[in-house]
Amino acid sequence: MTEPILQIRDLSVYYNQKKTLKDVSLDLYPNEITALIGPSGSGKSTLLRSINRMNDLNPEVTITGSIVYNGHNIYSPRTDTVDLRKEIGMVFQQPNPFPMSIYENVVYGLHLKGIRDKSILDHAVESSLKGASIWNEVKDRLHDSAVGLSGGQQQRVCIARVLATSPRIILLDEPTSALDPISAGKIEETLLLLKKDYTLAIVTRSMQQASRLSDRTGFFLEGDLLECGPTKAMFMNPKRKETEDYISGKFG
């Protein structure tokens, strides 16, 4: 059996001493898409932000448990969070390109690493934009502002910006919820292509999207991971009544 690339064990997250994520254990596997589903406020995004330590930015957050990546607990004091976020990239719900050119957006992370060689940067821009399935749309206007692109194009540039740092895991927090159906479809096609080379975890409110994209699904309710397993099995024969009710739209 394939070994997980990342192991979450007994992870709890407290906001102002209120336990919002409760003893969650979950594995992410190489070259798979894991969907995180559940009602608003169930802990999905909190878990995602814990995986690359984005929750560190909130001083009111306390975390217990462990997340093991590359054989080390990422919450160890010796973890370099800058390096961690290069290997575990994040794409947010709202497209958030920087107010600079498409080219500069993509190489932003490489500049932070001190890379200035134009040939390396040019290659990274082309390969990353191709990986995000947007190269053909922007290759003749790389020095135009990324803010002038459509919402779907902006989101794919944000994906390219993540790819440029050579991550192993990509986290996506409702990446299509702010987009029209055609743009959302292009993002989904891109994610299925990326699965060949990366591990992905996606928070989604769309059961159809989870069913189309993911290999595994985790269902969250009030901070608990109630059920997790292969997506087809969960959608066809959920083990928990709460899972069945949520998937069938009885609440949410």
Swiss-Prot record:
Give GO terms for biological process. phosphate ion transmembrane transport
Q: What EC number(s) does the entry state?
A: 7.3.2.1
Is Nuclease tagged as a keyword? Answer: no
Q: Which PROSITE patterns match?
A: ABC_TRANSPORTER_1 (PS00211), ABC_TRANSPORTER_2 (PS50893), PSTB (PS51238)
Q: Which GO terms describe its cellular component?
A: plasma membrane
Q: Which ranges does the record mark as transmembrane? A: none
Q: Which annotated residues bind ATP?
A: 38-45
What is its membrane topology?
A: Peripheral membrane protein
Q: Name one Pfam family in it.
A: ABC_tran
Could you tell me the superkingdom of the organism this chain comes from?
Bacteria
Q: Assign the protein's first listed, main location to one coarse class.
A: membrane
- Which enzyme class, named as a word? translocase
> Where, subcellularly, is it found?
Cell membrane
Q: Which UniProt keywords are present, listed alphabetically?
A: ATP-binding, Cell membrane, Membrane, Nucleotide-binding, Phosphate transport, Translocase, Transport
Q: Which GO terms describe its molecular function?
A: ATP binding; ATP hydrolysis activity; ATPase-coupled phosphate ion transmembrane transporter activity
The reaction(s) catalysed by this protein are: phosphate(out) + ATP + H2O = ADP + 2 phosphate(in) + H(+)
InterPro entries per the UniProt record, alphabetical: AAA+_ATPase, ABC_transporter-like_ATP-bd, ABC_transporter-like_CS, P-loop_NTPase, PstB-like
Similarity field: Belongs to the ABC transporter superfamily. Phosphate importer (TC 3.A.1.7) family.
The record ties this protein, via PANTHER family, to: ABC TRANSPORTER I FAMILY MEMBER 17
Relate the protein's function as given in its record: Part of the ABC transporter complex PstSACB involved in phosphate import. Responsible for energy coupling to the transport system.
The annotated subunit structure for this chain is: The complex is composed of two ATP-binding proteins (PstB), two transmembrane proteins (PstC and PstA) and a solute-binding protein (PstS).
| Name this protein carries in UniProt | Phosphate import ATP-binding protein PstB 1
This protein's encoding gene: pstB1
